[in-house]
A protein has these predicted regions:
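Acidic (Asp/Glu)-rich catalytic clusters
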Residues: 11-21, 44-52, 87-92, 111-117, ...
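H/E-rich (His + Asp/Glu) clusters that bind or coordinate divalent metals
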Residues: 96-98, 102-167
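A conditional alpha-helix N-cap/helix-loop micro-motif detector
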Residues: 5-6, 35-39, 78-81, 103, ...
């Protein structure tokens, strides 16, 4: 869903949920060019998501798209700082929000938002465990362990997680 679509995007959310059983939507602020907390740019679509009771997942942190390319292919990383989702979590306290990926280079900001807001969860996929910062591991094994999500096709046991960390 393009958050810039406003009312048309909100109608699309409702249609997809009601007619096709869609249970959530992924947003990629860097690729879609928006700040998640920009009320004018995307709150109409987010309001529809909240009303329909669906999960929202936001790409956070660096993206591989454009990495190393001239001008980063126009991708602006600033849009994917997880701190922008703090406002979204306040404004939509009943809407589940997932921070996709460890949010590098803003990992600690993502951890703070997930710890502070009960409706915010952290997805650990898309980043090799060997690059997880120690703070991320500490939070994942303690105060956020019930809010950490793993990509289903890459479920890691403790042993395989340790093995990947050592690689």
């Amino acid at each position: 869903i393009d958050p810039h679509k406003g009312k048309a995007g909100a109608r699309e959310v409702k249609r997809l949920v009601r007619d096709f059983g869609v249970r959530g939507f992924k947003f990629h602020p860097t690729m879609q060019g928006f700040f998640p907390n920009d009320r004018d740019a995307c709150y109409t679509v987010l309001e529809a998501c909240a009303e329909e009771g669906v999960i929202t997942l936001f790409h956070t942190g660096q993206t591989g798209v454009g990495s190393g390319m001239r001008g980063g292919m126009g991708m602006r990383l600033k849009y994917s700082n997880p701190m922008h989702l703090d406002d979204v979590a306040v404004d939509f306290p009943d809407m589940p929000i997932i921070l996709a990926h460890p949010s590098f280079p803003w990992t600690e900001e993502g951890l703070a938002v997930a710890q502070h807001k009960p409706n915010v969860y952290y997805d650990m996929s898309g980043w090799s465990p060997k690059y997880f910062p120690e703070t991320f591991i500490r939070y994942a094994n303690s105060i956020l362990k019930k809010k950490m999500l793993l990509e289903p096709r890459r479920m890691l046991t403790t042993a395989s997680f340790k093995k990947q960390r050592e690689c």
